[in-house]
Amino acid sequence: PMLDRLEYRAQLIEQALASAGFTPKGESAERAGFTPKGQSAERAKGHGTEHWVAVAGRGGMLPPMECGTYLVDDVMVAELKAARRGEHASNLGAVLALRFAQSAGANAYIVDPVTADEWQPCARLSGSPLVERTYIGHSLNTKAVARRYARQVGRSYAALRLIVIHMGSGITVSAHREGRMIDSNSIEEGPFGPDRTGSLPVRALIKLCGTMSPGELDRRVFGDGGLFAYLGTRDLMEVERRMDIGDREAAAVFDAMIYQIGKEAGAMAAVLEGKVDAVLVTGGMAHSDRVVARLRGYVDWIAPVKVYPGEDELRALADGVFRVLDGEEEARRMKTGI
């Protein structure tokens, strides 16, 4: 269980904080100079390491909830420790954040957790009442990139219609309208990635169910799928090295992955009724010129393409907390009984 790694992770954080000269001394947001509509980010830069006003952690496998900044409380921590919605390293984020925040007398927050769900109602119907589509994906980086683009073009995020393509260890392609992520693939669907299969033919998958245990099959589709299943590596750079020396199998699998990502972006263009202001490309794979060039061939007819390589999720966490401290957004609480 992921919870078994909690103390180890806490020790690593303590060591990193100590080496950087941070000590957990608390101070209220008001005393620190954080007031509604204030410039908290600038003040924080000069505030030093003497006092903590907030601690942010990565949101984990929680019940479906709106995007936003959430106050971490005992209810949320209990839900994450129970891991009813799956084991994931992000389940430790809020638990660790609350531990360190309490030692400093500060509040702990999560921002846009992986289960943050803003889908429109029609996106939830799967084709069978036995199975409802639910969202798990890269909300934090996806929403942060959308907001970043909005700032750069001088428009409100809520006024833009965007497709965001996140390409990391998993692939999330999402449609954004009126400041909400109204549809996307979930981590169990869509394009295959470095180690996930994405969508599979259902009847073929049913036939596999009797050939291996549920745990083994789950691993095959979520951890040992995608590039790894075909090529034995999750490393995109290794795949590109093979392509450079003429490996046709590597080239074929690479091309199929980009093809599927482009196809998913086309589906999101349909969700937005063809009215798209920009296609934003982000995540670790966006560092690859080859990936971006191939992908442009599939999506640049939709709208102008803007590339944001990498995943600046630490900044996204900080920005989410600053929106609360500045009074731009109210901190939410996870609903009970979900």
Regions found by a protein language model. Give the residues of each.
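General beta-strand structural signal in soluble alpha/beta enzymes
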Residues: V55-G57, N107-P113, I163-I165, D183-S184, ...
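Phosphate/pyrophosphate-binding loops at sites that engage ATP/ADP/AMP, CoA/4′-phosphopantetheine
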Residues: I13-E27, R43-V53, Q152-S156, A265-D277
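Adenine-nucleotide phosphate-binding core of ATP-dependent small-molecule kinases
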Residues: R219-G274
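Conserved phosphate-binding/catalytic loops in two-lobed NTP-binding clefts
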Residues: D289, A293-D319
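Structural signal for terminal/edge beta-strands and the immediately following C-terminal loop/tail
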Residues: P309-I338
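Glycine-rich phosphate-binding loop plus the immediately following alpha-helix
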Residues: L92-R99, I110, D117, L125, ...
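Short beta-strand-loop/turn "lid" adjacent to the catalytic site in phosphate-handling enzymes
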Residues: G21-E27, G48-A89, N107, T115-G127
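Glycine-rich phosphate-binding loops at beta-strand->alpha-helix junctions
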Residues: V276-L295
